[in-house]
């Protein structure tokens, strides 16, 4: 049965308000308009960014909304003017779009794209409206993806077609966490072979940064976390050292001592500005670089003595790992399919859509790296 041009009713996890459990609802998903694509979402992962918005501290957070931004599925139908995908294509949703036409895309200096940023930040499609409704109420879109719905509508620049042979259960992770961490090392910071690298925070993004450091040829990869249980994961993804920071009185001095002056690169995957300050201090004088990946809570600022940067240290940031989704993700998928790139290893838990709140519980318990949600099991 074809739903092309028709509204679809499906299951979705709706966030009606901040700090409230997600509610499984029957929602209506309108057909795609010009330059839009409707996707049947098969798998979605749960990310700390979803929890950040649900907590109510996200300045762009608004409700009611369909969260989720780490998803993969199959194109159901396309709107007028769509030429980059067609019905039946397997796709990864992209919260960082790539129009290839705006000032940012043409600069060659960033993976950020400005074309739909304003409306995406307001939870709307590029024309300023929503394709979701429930109980006669309009639902907002999330990060241009809304993967916690069995069907979603996205801009045609917010997804990329990938190999049909790639398992959607795994490659949905490339929509955020894995790409974000890996690319921060290889694309944003451009770590050189032989470097000493510190990764602070051993969740999915941090582990992916370690995988990136291995690929870059780093000679020493120091994983740092307050949870000693993360050591086994860190070593699995390439860490040569593990520091349980909860047991170290002066982390800055400790890292400086064990690295002969500090690290060449530090990657923050915590979003904690106090930790970021420590990381900058244990970057090596003269050339050490701090790459901030973790997103701090609204209103938080990073304070440091200018002397730290005057003497050669640098601070940079990374969004989606500096990776251009439409141009580069297909190659990531191919590398995974050839056995050269870890993805499956990040998945520690799986839940059906009806248990999505349990997926969030797994994430908060600290034992989960990534929990994937089977959207076909409502």
UniProtKB/Swiss-Prot annotation:
NAD(+) binds at residues 48, 201-206, 225, 293-295, 318-320. It catalyses: a primary alcohol + NAD(+) = an aldehyde + NADH + H(+); a secondary alcohol + NAD(+) = a ketone + NADH + H(+); S-(hydroxymethyl)glutathione + NADP(+) = S-formylglutathione + NADPH + H(+); S-(hydroxymethyl)glutathione + NAD(+) = S-formylglutathione + NADH + H(+). Its cofactor is Zn(2+). Zn(2+) 1 binds at residues 47, 69-70, 176. Disulfide bonds: none annotated. It comes from the Eukaryota. GO terms for molecular function: alcohol dehydrogenase (NAD+) activity; S-(hydroxymethyl)glutathione dehydrogenase (NAD+) activity; S-(hydroxymethyl)glutathione dehydrogenase (NADP+) activity; S-(hydroxymethyl)glutathione dehydrogenase [NAD(P)+] activity; S-nitrosoglutathione reductase (NADH) activity; zinc ion binding. Pfam families: ADH_N, ADH_zinc_N. This is Probable S-(hydroxymethyl)glutathione dehydrogenase 1. It comes from Schizosaccharomyces pombe (strain 972 / ATCC 24843). The lineage of its organism: Eukaryota, Fungi, Dikarya, Ascomycota, Taphrinomycotina.
């Amino acid at each position: 049965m074809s739903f092309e041009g028709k509204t679809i009713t499906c299951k979705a996890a709706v966030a009606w308000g901040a700090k409230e459990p997600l509610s499984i609802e029957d929602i209506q998903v309108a057909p795609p308009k010009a330059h839009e694509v409707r996707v049947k979402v098969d798998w979605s992962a749960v990310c700390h960014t979803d929890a950040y918005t649900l907590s109510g501290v996200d300045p762009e957070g608004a409700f009611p909304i369909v969260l989720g931004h780490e998803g993969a599925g199959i194109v159901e139908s396309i709107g007028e003017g769509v030429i980059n995908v067609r019905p039946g294509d397997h796709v990864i949703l992209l919260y960082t779009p790539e129009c290839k036409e705006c000032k940012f895309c043409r600069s060659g200096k960033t993976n950020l794209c400005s074309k739909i940023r304003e409306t995406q930040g307001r939870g709307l499609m590029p024309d300023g409206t929503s394709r979701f409704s429930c109980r006669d109420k309009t639902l907002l879109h999330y990060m241009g993806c809304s993967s916690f719905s069995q069907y979603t509508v996205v801009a045609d620049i917010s997804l990329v077609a990938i190999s049909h042979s790639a398992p959607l259960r795994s490659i949905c992770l490339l929509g955020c966490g894995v790409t974000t961490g890996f690319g921060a090392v290889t694309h944003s910071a451009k770590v050189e072979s032989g470097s000493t690298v510190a990764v602070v925070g051993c969740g999915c993004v941090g582990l992916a940064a370690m995988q990136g450091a291995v690929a870059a040829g780093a000679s020493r990869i120091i994983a740092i976390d307050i949870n000693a249980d993360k050591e086994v994961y860190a070593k699995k993804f390439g860490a040569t050292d593990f520091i349980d920071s909860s047991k170290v009185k002066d982390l800055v001095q400790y890292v400086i001592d064990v690295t002969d002056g500090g690290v060449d690169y530090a990657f923050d995957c915590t979003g904690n500005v106090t930790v970021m300050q420590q990381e900058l201090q244990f970057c090596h004088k003269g050339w050490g670089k701090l790459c901030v990946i973790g997103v701090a809570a609204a209103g938080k600022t990073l304070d440091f003595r200018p002397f730290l940067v005057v003497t050669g240290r640098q601070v940079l940031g990374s969004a989606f790992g500096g990776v251009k989704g439409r141009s580069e993700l297909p190659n990531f998928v191919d590398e995974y399919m050839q056995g050269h790139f870890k993805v499956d290893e990040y998945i520690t838990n799986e839940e059906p859509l009806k248990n999505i709140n349990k997926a969030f519980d797994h994430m908060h318990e600290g034992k989960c790296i990534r929990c994937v949600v089977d959207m076909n099991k409502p």
